[in-house]
Amino acid sequence: AGSGIEGADGLCASLAQAAGLGGAWVAWVSTSSVDAISRLAADGRWTLIDGATEVFPSRGDVQFGPLHAIDTAENGEVVSDLGDVFVWTNTDRFGKNVTAGQANACDDWSGQTGTADVGVVVDPQAAMGLSWTDTGQPRACGSEFRLYCFES
């Protein structure tokens, strides 16, 4: 799938294709030069893969957190251990790079050294609902975590 943000997008695209999902897909990750929010369509509305369960009514609503946990994989599998599943993002609740002005996440997603910020799959009604994209607890770049993929 390659490396960097293109590699993350490629992984999202290949997983979506394997699951029979159409469209183009991007990973919800930020780099030193690209904020995740800028990669989403301005007029978007995002749901879980069922097409009915609304997560974000619009791009502007991302800052308020998801209406429903982003708890469904591309194959329909529901993540049941909410609060224990980490997701690579390096992105704050406004969709901006968490480490702006600093050494960036895992060499802009091309390396395995250093750390990057993660989100966590959570119930949006929980006290930690906004940590879906930013826990404030960076993790080692060599770790294997999930990605949030948005249809673009």
Features from the language model and the residues they span:
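Secreted/extracellular ectodomain signature
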Residues: A1-S152
